[in-house]
Amino acid sequence: MTRFIFVTGGVVSSLGKGIASASLAAVLEARGLKVTILKLDPYINVDPGTMSPFQHGEVFVTDDGAETDLDLGHYERFIRTRMTKRNNFTTGRVYETVLRKERRGDYLGGTVQVIPHITDEIKRRILAGGDGVDIALVEIGGTVGDIESQPFLEAVRQLKVELGNQRALLMHLTLVPYIATAGETKTKPTQHSVKELRSIGLQPDILLCRSEKEIDVDSRRKISLFTNVEERAVVPLPDAKSIYLIPRLLQSYNLDQIVLDKFGLEAAETDLAEWDEVVRREQNPEHAVTIAMVGKYMDLLDAYKSLNEALLHAGLHTLTKVKINYINAEDVETQGVSILEDADAILVPGGFGERGLEGKLMAVRYARENKVPYLGICLGMQTAVIEFARNVLKLDGANSTEFDRKSPFPVIGLITEWINEEGKVETRDESSDLGGTMRLGAQECHLEENSRIREIYGKANIIERHRHRFEVNNRFLDQLRQGGLRIGGWSSDDTLVEVVEVPDHPWFVACQFHPEFTSTPRDGHPLFTSYIQAAVEQNERAK
């Protein structure tokens, strides 16, 4: 029987509901409980797949091909449970489902309303998402008081009544600002945030109080008095030097035990040894490297959230402090490759659109010709192939049909047919919708014998997540191979190129898949670990 923890935020956005939810889930998992987390997004887009990274940040892809909120990446990095399309839904998705039912006649001609039809669909999705686990945390996006959040909060209110106190509790994350000139923390914003919640019928059971520094006992007592939350359940959550300290921080305030007490559950003692080891590795590096990440969305680093984290995870597993130098690809075009000279390794991540392409190609060429370790991901693999075609094979005008449909040498082209994660054939053409039409989700890849990528993974077949609609054009494979480019991996049906390598290079690997989506701080990822190790060796050679 699943218990639900509903997580809301108040006062301001970006307080860290996702990290707080994931950290609590990690502590509960460390007590032997099976945990999952849902993210409910109030925006009207069906999913974030077509949203600009500047608007939304990264689109995180699950094994089953769902394009989801980046918070699901945090969830997977903190707990062992794999997220699926059930773990994230939006207002747009809910309305789409309800309207489809209305068109089908499921409501028998009745008037379709927010209550009960929209709220019922939200409740149905929450209960389905929590099926089969001990505890499901449900994070409501946005801030209490937002007009977009109202149907979700009403659904939570109804579920709390229907499930009862033994199966549902509300945890509210709020800001307790520290006013330096007065030398004190202010509890009024929290009081008003809870007042707003109570006005719609929701009484928090737990308050997580975000603050610059730990709030004192008197402030906690005052918050407890004015919000009707027991004092021990007013939990401080001060700024931390590392997000990996937060599970231990929450456990030190007995938040996990408070949750279990409220649910009437018993569980094993907390074992956070793995997280303590992560923190130990983070705080005791033996090496330091600089990675030049050359991309398009450098003004919003959340656009590469999983990639940033994967590089840091690799640093943990090689005892290396990883500094990421974020370089706008257009700056390479205007300033030249000299801005890459301090890098121990170069990385070109995924992306869409032609802007910055030439700068990425310049970065690839610099890495290839100067023997600097290079990792290309998704578009980073496609740019590696284009650069190789232009500068090694001398195919002037080689390009992707995404950027130039009239290219004389279209070495990258649209995928028109592939097998999806369910084993079904999917087809697309130039007129297909942009939303939800890419090759998405976990796909099996076959790694070639004697390739670097097979040596890195240590096995012949791997499963990695994808998000793309363009691929290497097989018409040019013979030329690419003859020129010295090695095909390191293929799709399961041996029709799509998954990995390319430059053999006469210390470390040059580019992949069509997104390995960053499966990297975690506790386990790392073999590809990133090998890449950072190559950067360490490059750094030592340069000394």
Swiss-Prot record:
One GO BP: 'de novo' CTP biosynthetic process
GO terms for cellular component: cytosol
Positions of ATP binding: S14, L15, G16, K17, G18, I19, D71
Molecular functions (GO terms): ATP binding; CTP synthase activity; glutaminase activity; identical protein binding; metal ion binding
EC number: 6.3.4.2
Reactions catalysed, as given in the entry: UTP + L-glutamine + ATP + H2O = CTP + L-glutamate + ADP + phosphate + 2 H(+); L-glutamine + H2O = L-glutamate + NH4(+); UTP + NH4(+) + ATP = CTP + ADP + phosphate + 2 H(+)
Active site: C378 (nucleophile), H514, E516
Binding-site positions, Mg(2+): D71, E139
Family assignment from sequence similarity: Belongs to the CTP synthase family.
Note: CTPSs have evolved a hybrid strategy for distinguishing between UTP and CTP. The overlapping regions of the product feedback inhibitory and substrate sites recognize a common feature in both compounds, the triphosphate moiety. To differentiate isosteric substrate and product pyrimidine rings, an additional pocket far from the expected kinase/ligase catalytic site, specifically recognizes the cytosine and ribose portions of the product inhibitor.
Name of this protein: CTP synthase
Organism listed in the record: Saccharophagus degradans (strain 2-40 / ATCC 43961 / DSM 17024)
